[in-house]
Amino acid sequence: MREVGFAPSMRAYFQVLPHSFYNRDPREVGTDLLGKILLRRQGRKVLTGRIVEVEAYLGADDPAAHASIGRTLRNAVLFGPPGHAYVYFIYGNHFCLNVSCLPDGVPGGILFRAVQPIKGTDEMFKLRGIPEGSDLRRLTSGPGRLAAAFGITRERDNGKDLTDPRSDLYIADDGKPPPRVVVTQRSGIMKAVEMPLRYIVAGNRFVSGKKLSVARPGASR
């Protein structure tokens, strides 16, 4: 892993995840992304959040995946090298952040559904357009809220290399022990809803949606 390009005082705490981290089955990547840090440079400010909920999309054999229809101009990032941002616009009102997985030419990805805000919450509230001091749990829970709070758009971020420490958006490891993981069905889709491809940090209050009623605990690591 490479050091993130922040101030010297932060370099000891964050190491950017390399391409090899994402060059794997999305199910493995999804589990291992939990507990990692999403980082955004927003002007002179730094926004960070701990990843607490993601979903895996398996590519051509996954009916719910954008890649299942084959390569298009819109989803081309999913067919490219691993570790790149795939951003799409949905429901006419919000963006969603994904990261490509698997080797170049083989589609697969992870959707980021929720993070636990750590640093820069004042700027996140501004980007969301809601009053500072509003319910912090709802600030970044859900893919649309997360993207808005981190200033993520398709024009700005689609195709961005999330392993580049010179970038203004990347994912890093701060050395914290891996969390306990819960695996359940994906949310907000119409196809392949039974597939257990949603990964959640057990007991975290920043996870999106209602309290889980059907889930199986992942192995404590």
Predicted features, each with a name:
Residues 6-221:
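Conserved, well-structured core segments that form or line functional sites
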